[in-house]
Amino acid sequence: FQINSDEYGIPQARKRVIIMGIRSDLMSSGGPRRYLEKSHPITVKEILESMPKLRSGISKINGQSIKDSEDVWKKEVLNWFGLKSKIKDKEVKELLFKHFLPAIKKSSLSRGDEFFASSDYKKSCNNLPKDLKKWLFDPKLKGFINSSTRSHMDSDLKRYIYNSVHTEVYGKPPLLDDYPDFLQPNHANKKQGVHKDRFRTLDPERPSKTITSHISKDGHAFIHF
C-alpha cells in the first residue's frame, strides 16, 4: 500500500510504497494501515535548526575559478551592500540590508565535513519529536556526519540570497520576472517562459520535497531558507 511519508514522521513529502506481511488471524477490517500511527509533519525548519549553521563554498567569481575560503566567500556575499540601489522591492531590500547581511558580517561559519566534532551535537536534536530524535541521534557520536556544503558560482549565490529573502517576505520564491535585471540568468530558454520557477527556496514551515542535496539537474530547486 502507499503512504504519504510526511504524515508518519519522515521529513520528506514523498509518496512511498510499503510492503507489509500480516498474519491472516491478526488482520482486521482496517487493513495494514491500522498498524501505522500518524504524526505531525516534520518541517524543513525543524530539521535544519537541529543542525549546525554552515556556509556554502564559492567556486567562481566573474567566470574565473577561485580557491574558496571563508574570507573570500564573506567578501563576495557582502558585495551586496554595493548593489542596494539596484533592488527595487522595498520589503526585500529592508530584510536583506538591515538583517540578513549584518548577520552574515558577524558570522563565522564552516562548510562542514564528512564528520566534524561539535559540542552542540548532544543538544542538537532536543526539539525534534521523540521518535525522530531516536532515529537520528547516536550518543556514541561526538559530532555530525555527512553534513557538508557544495560550492556555487558568484552569480548563482546572489540569486540564492535574493530568492531566500524574497521567500521570507512573501511566503513563496520569486519567479524569474521578479528578479532585478542584474540577477537575470543568461539561459537560452529564459524568454520562452520555460521553468520560470527554476530557483526555489524550501518552505521552512513544510516538509521538504526531498532530502536536500545539490544535484546537478535540480540544485536550484532546494535553496535553504
Regions found by a protein language model. Give the residues of each.
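Conserved hydrophobic/aromatic beta-strand scaffold that supports enzyme active sites
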Residues: Q2, R16-M20, T210
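Residues at the C-termini of beta-strands that transition into short coil/loop
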Residues: N4, P52, I215
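Flexible, glycine-/basic-rich loop-and-beta segments that form/coincide
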Residues: G9-K67
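C-terminal target-recognition/interaction regions appended to catalytic cores
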Residues: S69-F225
